[in-house]
Curated annotation (Swiss-Prot):
Organism of derivation: Pseudomonas paraeruginosa (strain DSM 24068 / PA7) (Pseudomonas aeruginosa (strain PA7))
One cellular component (GO) term of this entry: cytoplasm
Function statement: Involved in urease metallocenter assembly. Binds nickel. Probably functions as a nickel donor during metallocenter assembly.
Record key words, sorted: Chaperone, Cytoplasm, Nickel, Nickel insertion
Gene name for this UniProt entry: ureE
Keyword Cytoplasm: yes
Gene3D superfamilies: Urease metallochaperone UreE, N-terminal domain, UreE, C-terminal domain
Cellular compartment(s): Cytoplasm
Protein name: Urease accessory protein UreE
Xref: Pfam families: UreE_C, UreE_N
Keyword ATP-binding among record annotations: no
Major localization listed first in the record, in broad terms: cytoplasm
Amino acid sequence: MLVIHQRLPARSPRWDEELHLTYEARSKSRLRCFAASGEEVGLFLERGLPPLADGDCLEARDGRVVRVFARAEELLHVTCASPLELTRAAYHLGNRHVALQVGEGWLRLLDDYVLKAMLEQLGASVNAIQAPFQPEHGAYGGGHHHSHHGEAEFNYAPRLHQFGVRR
């Protein structure tokens, strides 16, 4: 079994093995799967980090570099007649905590017949497609969480808009 414990800080121009994973699989820190070669793989990554992205590289215990590829999935591709309608669609999907990929004039989400009906009711054009899915990360660190009575406020640093900071 190819055992992987570490993400590499940068994408590597060369790799020894490939993992083709769905978004759900790329979201897991613990996973048993198979490499493109058919070799069994065990992922034991640090918890609490963003999902693996297409092109990310990992280092196996034996020193091999493994590149991650986003596998094509059944998605809904959403477009609208106006930016206002697209914003409204994004608002309603966000209100339901739906993982959402945002592009120039379009949204993509995992195929779901209930959400498809809702979007069509809002006037959106919704088409089923097969494509890799790379949704937005949350705007704040620490994952998804709601404060509850008696808990301290969460003070996550923003990840989207750090004005004056260049990366």
